[in-house]
Each structure stands twice: as C-alpha cells, then as structure tokens.
C-alpha cells in the first residue's frame, strides 16, 4: 500500500469533512495500524507538500497539515465520483476534447484531471466521455488557464452503430475486463464485513475508522482507472455496479462509529476535530446522522 496515496485518502475522506486540518501526530496515529510507520508518514507528507497537495502550518514544534487549494479541488473532482449514488441516465451523447496547445509542464496534471472527469483517450490527441456536463469542463479549463488551447465538441450515437458494437468498442478501449477483476477483489475483501454487520456484529470505533479508510482508498484506486459509463455501454452484471452498491451500504454502516473515533482521537490546532460538515451526510445519496 502506497503511503502517499493512503494519506491523500485520509485528507479527502476524513479531514476535509472535519475542519480541513490535522496534526502530524494524528496522521501517524490514523495509519499506524495499516502498516504505515511514523518515519514513512513524515516522508510522505513532506513530499505531498512539495508536490502541491498539502500545505503546512507550524506552532512551536508541532506541524498541522491541510489540502492546498489545488489539492482540495483535485480531490473534490474525485469525490463527485467516489460518493456518487449512481443511476445517471444517458441519451447517447458524447463529449470530445482535443488539447491544441497544452504546455508540457501541465500535461500530466491536466490528463489526470480529465480522467477524474470521466474522459479517456480514444485516438492520438482526442479524449472522450459519454454524456457529462459543460460546467465541469469549463471549471477545469479555467483552473489550467486553457480556455483558448482546447477544442470541445459534442457527438451523438446513431442507429448505424448497434449497442453490441458500442459495448465491444468500450470494452476494448476502456479495458473493462481488468477493471472488473479489480472490482471482484474489492467485493471479496469487504463483503464479509458487511455480512457480519448485517448479522448484528458491532464494529469498535477504531475498527470502523480503519475499515472506512481502507474501503474508500481501495475504491478510489480503482475509480482512478475507471470511467463512469452508462449501463447501456457496460457488460451485463457489471461488477462495478455491485462494488458501488456494497461501498455505499458499508460506508453508511461505518459512518457513525468511525466519526466517533475521528472526533475523540484526532486533533488539530483547536483540539479535537469538529463535527462533520453538512455535505458529509449527502455522500452516497444520503447518510443518517447518529442520534
């Protein structure tokens, strides 16, 4: 497990919902039981700060970390997919995006951001996604100051191409077979926990926190390589749908006990972390507040 990636998940899933800042010692405490030692934590947050993901504030000998503005925006794009309830309809439309003047130093970050928006390369220099909205593209172009360096077009499928042919094209270019195997592994890893909770077994706050962090980390890792495709373009019994339903249900089960751990064991400059932001309860279509 990559320490840097896990720490990004910690900030995106947890810290962003509880004040946006955390003490370095609490970061180490959060991931210690998951095999990330203190030395690796310090090295990882230093590198994440250097790469522009995190910013640091120091008070005496203590360091407190939070997302940078750009780091927070990047994760927010991911969050729109991670915590989606699914079920979006599709009317056969496609968005095509062709960078015409992309500076070399922006290339990797821009393409990663395109991936989170659901775009994939379909030919040299052309990216496509089914459906989608213009606002997310406009925000991305504004962020990278590329409004004059990118061509955006819309296309539509017709009856000249059958759904079977479209599914074959998507399966090949989106590499669905590899993704489906990853989703199966995710389901195999977390379904036993869901079954145990359904039978009335209670998760201790620290265990719920660790399970929640691992769930979102593994789910995010797969989504980074997946594109949110409509059901019309997916294979029958697509395991990505099963994985999303499992993640949604399990996250709801773990929300209350994991939040208990977060607010009693982790600290920032003001002391214990504050209550969850209101939009935390909108994740996965709605999470019930603890009584």
Place the predicted regions along the sequence by residue.
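Short, Lys/Arg-rich nucleic-acid/phosphate-binding segment
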Residues: 58-64
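Amphipathic alpha-helical dimerization/coiled-coil segments
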Residues: 80-122
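Short amphipathic alpha-helical interaction segments
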Residues: 36-47
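Glycine-centered, phosphate/nucleic-acid-interacting loop/turn motifs that mediate DNA/RNA or nucleotide
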Residues: 52
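C-terminal regulatory/effector modules of DNA-binding transcriptional regulators
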Residues: 167-291
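Mid-protein regulatory/catalytic core that forms ligand/cofactor-binding pockets
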Residues: 104-200
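Short alpha-helical segments that sit at the start of domains
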Residues: 1-13, 73
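Short acidic, hydrophobic short linear motifs in intrinsically disordered regions
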Residues: 18-31
